[in-house]
């Protein structure tokens, strides 16, 4: 059973440029450490304000979720970047979702660009 690990970070809008510059460094860190490549997004419309960043990745097991969080938590490079980013946070939290797979259900088809 697969799981989605998601970090949600609401940051001060006036610090967006500095926050995103640090986030780019986190993306580079993921590549260097060969960690799961997260997908970053921000709300365009919805409940969360636009000055919210979501990082998420899909992992095959709950153990893999725990291993990923543990690897990030004990990594000194990650800790250094996080210490620089925390002052911009208004709030941050972690979510874990179970991926639902219904037998016989077909995946959504992608629309072609015109």
Q: What is the meaning of each model-derived region?
A:
Residues 36-54, 79-114:
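Glycine-rich beta-strand-turn "strand-cap" elements at beta-sheet edges
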Residues 15-41, 73, 81:
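Short amphipathic alpha-helical segments
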Residues 15, 32, 60-63, 101:
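A short, structured loop/turn motif at beta-sheet edges
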Residues 17-19, 65-67, 104-106:
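Short acidic, gly/pro-rich beta-turn/loop elements at beta-sheet edges
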Residues 3-11, 39-73, 109-112:
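Short, well-ordered beta-strand segments in beta-rich or mixed alpha/beta enzyme
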Residues 8, 12, 20, 27, ...:
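Compositionally biased, low-structure terminal segments
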């Amino acid at each position: 059973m697969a799981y989605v690990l998601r970090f949600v970070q609401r940051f001060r809008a006036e610090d967006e440029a500095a926050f995103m510059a640090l986030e780019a460094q986190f993306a580079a860190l993921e590549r260097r450490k060969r960690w799961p490549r997260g997908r970053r997004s921000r709300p365009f419309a919805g409940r969360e304000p636009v000055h919210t960043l979501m990082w998420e990745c899909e992992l095959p097991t709950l153990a893999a979720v725990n291993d990923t969080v543990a690897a990030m938590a004990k990594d000194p490079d990650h800790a250094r970047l996080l210490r620089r980013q925390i002052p911009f946070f208004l709030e941050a939290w972690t979510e874990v979702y179970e991926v639902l797979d219904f037998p016989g259900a077909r995946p959504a088809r992608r629309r072609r660009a015109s």
